[in-house]
Amino acid sequence: MKSLNRQTVSRFRKLSVPAAIMMLLSTIISGIGTFLHYREELMPSACANGWIQYDKHCYLDTNIKMSTDNAVYQCRKLRARLPRPDTRHLRVLFSIFYKDYWVSLKKTNDKWLDINNDKDIDISKLTNFKQLNSTTDSEACYIYKSGKLVKTVCKSTQSVLCVKRFYK
């Protein structure tokens, strides 16, 4: 192997500094480009586009009016559910969206159900328990209207808001 003289070594050093700088800049720019391209995978947002974030939940106004059965189906397609009647977020949702919307409360044959999962609900824990308990209808669904749960016909069409937890 032939050894290099001092001048050649000096030339390589002089050429190596700009080459190293170019390589460093190239690596940084490539890293930034990769980050921007894969931003959603690397740093997912809590809520998808169109969903509104509030207190570890994402809310979507579907801008559709439909019956309770269709509303539940629509929210399930979005991997979400109707708002529960016992959540403290109902008033906040009303102030954000400013419309009446379905909640997941239904009375069927004197049983109170969460229509998201067909499980029984203890209505004594709800804020307007006395008003709900006085309902004599065998079947009724409920909307949230101006700070209250209001009885309505299940087949009527009302606004649909869907809710889901972050990162689900």
UniProtKB/Swiss-Prot annotation:
Q: What is its main location?
A: virion
- Which is an annotated Pfam family here? Lectin_C
**Which UniProt keywords are given for this protein, alphabetically ordered?**
Disulfide bond, Glycoprotein, Host Golgi apparatus, Membrane, Signal-anchor, Transmembrane, Transmembrane helix, Virion
Q: Where would you find this protein in the cell?
A: Virion membrane; Host Golgi apparatus
What cystine linkages occur within this chain?
C75-C162, C141-C154
Its topology with respect to the membrane? Single-pass type II membrane protein
Q: How does it assemble?
A: Interacts with protein OPG161. Interacts with protein OPG164. Interacts with protein OPG190.
Q: What is this protein called?
A: Protein OPG162
Q: Which organism is it from?
A: Monkeypox virus
Gene coding for it? OPG162
